[in-house]
UniProtKB/Swiss-Prot annotation:
Keywords: ATP-binding, Cytoplasm, Kinase, Metal-binding, Nucleotide biosynthesis, Nucleotide-binding, Transferase, Zinc. Its EC number is 2.7.4.3. InterPro entries: Adenyl_kin_sub, Adenylat/UMP-CMP_kin, Adenylat_kinase_CS, Adenylate_kinase_lid-dom, P-loop_NTPase. GO terms for biological process: AMP salvage. This is Adenylate kinase. Pathway: Purine metabolism; AMP biosynthesis via salvage pathway; AMP from ADP: step 1/1. GO terms for molecular function: adenylate kinase activity; ATP binding; zinc ion binding.
Length: 218
């Protein structure tokens, strides 16, 4: 089962991916993880990524595509995978099609967790993180027992700069602008499945598992 997860920050992709991984025993792959792994291993591609990251530039499509292809050839991807954060561009989407074709595979579906701007702002701007242990809270949906204090270690809960409202709005708008062509691309290929990411995790998972059940019957 070969999947792409699409959705703005705060859509819950990580939560849904975790549940799918547990059920289907397939890896959840993000480009960030791929970059970190390549750098840690000190491979030739990893060294190139390290140089680019150190210089403050974005990793070009060609290098990202090569690293993704290398990752998808690993044994744990034989039964399938979830790609998160890739593809980000039409160029990358076309490259993914080509690399899967070479491997004798195809994409089963691009799952788009659609969430409006106000919901994303509410979810992320109410997030708090322990400055000591990194545990994540939410002042509305997952508050600590004592306001501003971590339940586990007693550390101070802080709001990360990335979680502040103006930054969240900017990130959301950039994501929608960049992702719109991808949504159309996968819609035209009849690969797009749009889920209402405003619903509860359980409601979304029920619909998602129904979709994935259809892929299993192929």
């Amino acid at each position: 089962m070969n999947l792409i997860f699409l959705g703005p920050p705060g859509a819950g992709k990580g939560t849904y991916a975790k549940r799918v991984v547990e059920k289907y025993i397939i890896p959840h792959i993000s480009t960030g993880d791929i970059f970190r792994e390549a750098i840690a291993k000190g491979t030739e591609l990893g060294r190139k990524v390290q140089d680019i990251v150190n210089s403050g530039n974005l990793v070009p499509d060609e290098l990202t595509n090569a690293l993704v292809e290398e990752r998808l050839k690993q044994d744990d991807c034989k039964k399938g995978f979830i790609l998160d954060g890739y593809p980000r561009t039409l160029n990358q989407a076309q490259a993914l099609n080509e690399m899967l074709k070479k491997m004798g595979k195809e994409l089963d579906g691009a799952i788009y967790f659609e969430v409006d701007e106000e919901t994303v702002v509410q979810r992320i701007s109410t997030r708090r993180v322990c400055s000591k242990c990194g545990k994540v809270y939410n002042v509305i949906t997952l508050p600590s027992k004592v306001e501003g204090i971590c339940d586990d270690c007693g550390g101070t809960l802080i709001q990360r700069d990335d979680d502040k409202e103006d930054i969240v709005r900017s990130r959301y708008r950039v994501y929608i602008e960049k992702t719109s062509p991808l949504i159309e691309y996968y819609k035209n290929q009849n690969k797009l499945f749009t889920l209402d990411g405003r619903k509860s995790v359980e409601e979304v998972m029920k619909i998602l598992f129904n979709i994935l059940g259809g892929f299993e019957k192929k």
